[in-house]
Amino acid sequence: MIYGANASGKSNIVKALQTMKTIVISSAKKQRGDKLPITPFLLGNEDNKPTKFEIIFIQNDTKYQYGFILNSEKILEEWLLIFGESNRAQKWFERIYNEKEEKYNYSFGTKFLGSKQLWAENTRDNALFLSVAIQLNNEQLKPVFDFF
């Protein structure tokens, strides 16, 4: 439930969550070169300025912090943190685009298991690592994907 005064941004929050959901669910299905569904700020003059999405949520009694930064062409950053019983953040994965090298740098936490290299190698510029790993049968990320 979202409460707030008129013109306080409630509709924009819903639209942002819908856009985030669309990107998470559909990015692995995009073809190389397909644009990502980002609408730049209508009054701005920077069409390809990066947009950040981040959400903290609880799924199956576990707290997650997931987010990504993108423009219309590629995912620039992506991360997932899990909060254990001590409520301390554990990094499961982080992906950052290195413009100088024109490649992604990945880092993985020790609690994140599976074929990390395979998933990373199959993640295109315009796809989320989360979405690709799910397409390639990662069970550990299923609660995060299912949230959307």
Locations of regions flagged by a protein language model:
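Conserved P-loop NTP-binding catalytic core
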Residues: 1, 5, 11-66, 71-75
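Electropositive, glycine-dotted interaction segments
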Residues: 65-148
